[in-house]
Amino acid sequence: MNDPLFPLPDATESLVARVTAAPRVQRPNRTQLQLRPIDLEALLPPAHRARVVWDFVEGLDLSPLYQTIKAVEGHAGRSAIDPAILMALWLYATLEAVGSARARARLCEEHDAYRWICGGVAVNYHTLADFRVDHAEVLDGLLTTSVAALMAEGLVALTRVAQDGVKIRASAGGASFRRGERLAQCLAAATAQVGALREQLEADPGAGSRREVAARRRAVEERQRRVAEALAQVPGLEARRRKAGVKGPARLSTTDPDARVMKMADGGFRPAFNAQLMTTTQGQVIVGVELTNAGTDQGQLHPMVEQVRRRYGGGPTEVLADGGYVDLDDLRAVAGAEPGCKVYAPPPGADDPTRAHRPLWRVDDALVGEWRQRMATAEAKAVYRERAATSECVNALARNRGLRQLGVRGLRNARAVLLWFALAHNLMRAAGLRAAGAPAT
């Protein structure tokens, strides 16, 4: 009498069914075509660093770059990429420690900040790589005008500056260094190889082989050029080594003839360049940039003071440098080029008593005597302490932004990379100084 109208499922059976059933998930469908609106302006917040970089670039005078563009209105030809885009891409990537042109080209397709800077303009790695090193003179001028603008606003003053050198690993290996005799053999071999490839190219093979042979020929010609440059520098390097009393034959790199083996910060010896930066202690703005292949900092003080005077129409009042810059001729040159300029550097013997009695410093010189007396005062020691807080901070930022090993070769190209870093550093300092609004003292 209590039988149900239809059979009911057992409670245990339904529980087992629920437990053993396949989970329901959303699977990716990568073949589905989608149309999505893209608002590049909405990709970045208002205070994003890319916007700061773009505002800085818009304030620069890029007319020398625009004058090199051959495509003009009313004539045939493909439109060129706006130099402001390339300038902003390199500055922003420098701040983000991205040093490879290929990596930056990929980021222009994948990263929102780079896509915002490009604004829909396609940029390839070859264009980026060429732009990095082709306009060193323009970058040098932009450094001067941008710092001069800060000086006009009262945010930067050349009253007190600090100079320091930082060793940057060159794009060359230690095994690439050869003596003069070996360089001559390498040049003869490269010349013969270029001739053989030229004959092979003139034989007119298939189109594919012709392109391959042409690429190989360009690579060998580039090596031939570098070896010839290295061989031409051998006599001058040997003369400098004899003057300095260095024994042994001179060796130069077949990969980068301008690189020199230097003692690095970790105590090792590797091919490198010596980057010289002069920075204001108030605001930490880079006002002078130079790149040399000298292994020491001696003799670098006067050229940098002269560069700053030439850039801004007046040199610094006080210069702070470490003991590696102490050179009698350099101190005299600074005093002669910029009267009234005081050099704050530790005298010989401050950290090494054995150096205090060398003949070079046992001279009856009023300049040396005044310098020693000044550095013995508590006031001078307090001023000198600002050197580490300025130069070492800038050097650390350089390392953090990828200025450890160069991806280019040659002094000129390496100096262009250093100028990119200086401009990127200064644009962030300018943004901070303008936000603070504190006048320089």
Predicted regions and their residues:
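Anion-binding and metal-coordination hotspots
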Residues: M1-L15, L33-L35, H75, A97-E110, ...
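Hydrophobic alpha-helical membrane-insertion signals
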Residues: N2-R51
